[in-house]
C-alpha cells in the first residue's frame, strides 16, 4: 500500500489544472487554424484539374540561344526580378537608362525625362487626369501667385504714398525757407536804412557845429 501510494502523482491545485487545460485548448485551436490556412494556400496555389500549362516566357528568352550567349542567358535566368523596396513604399528598380544615365527605368520608359514619344498635350492631360494631387498643386501655385501680386501692389502703393508725403513735406519746407529768407532780407534792409539815417544825422550835426564856429 505504501509503495503504491508513493508512486502516485500529487494532485495539482485546481487553478493550475485549469490553466493547463486552457493552454492545451489554445494550442489545439492554433494548430487547427494553421492546418486550415495551409489547406487554403495549397488549394488556391494549385492549378485547377485539367489545366494545360502553356509555355511561360522566361527572361533569358530575349537573348538568342546561340553559341557565345550562354553566360548572358545564365545571368538573366537567375537575375533578380523584384526591385528593392525602399521606405515610404518607393520601389527602386535595378536598371539604368542609357539616355539620361539614371537608375530606376529603362530606355523608352515614360519615367525618362527624354521620353518625347506621342502627343505631349495628351501626355499632360493624362498626368493631370491620373494624378489626384495635380489640381491641388496647381491651385496652390495659383493662390501663391495671386498673394504675391497683392503683396507687390500693396508695397507699390505704400511707396507711392510715402513719396507723395515726402514731396509735400519737402515743398512745405521750401516755402518756409523762402519766407524766412524774405524776412531776413527785410530785416537787413531796415537795419541798413536805420544806419544810413544815423549817418546822415551825424553828418548834419557835424556840419552845423562847423558853421557856428
Curated annotation (Swiss-Prot):
Signal peptide residues on this chain, from the entry's feature table: none
Keywords associated with the record: Isopeptide bond, Metal-binding, Nucleus, Phosphoprotein, Ubl conjugation, Zinc, Zinc-finger
Cross-link for Glycyl lysine isopeptide (Lys-Gly) (interchain with G-Cter in SUMO2), residue positions: 121
Location of Phosphoserine modifications: 204, 206
Region annotated Disordered, chain positions: 1-61, 154-213
InterPro entries hit by this protein: PAP-1
Zinc finger (CCHC-type): 96-114
GO biological process, any: RNA splicing
Cellular compartment(s): Nucleus
Expressed in which tissues: Highly expressed in the testis, moderately in the kidney, liver and spleen, and weakly in the skeletal muscle and heart.
PIM1-binding: region residues: 1-147
GO molecular function, one term: zinc ion binding
Compositional bias ranges of the Basic and acidic residues kind: 9-21, 52-61
GO cellular component terms, semicolon-separated: nuclear speck
Basic residues bias spans: 176-204
Role played: Is thought to be a target protein for the PIM1 kinase. May play some roles in B-cell proliferation in association with PIM1.
Alphabetized PANTHER family for the sequence: RETINITIS PIGMENTOSA 9 PROTEIN
Assembly behavior: Binds to PIM1. Binds to ZNHIT4.
Protein name per the record: Retinitis pigmentosa 9 protein homolog
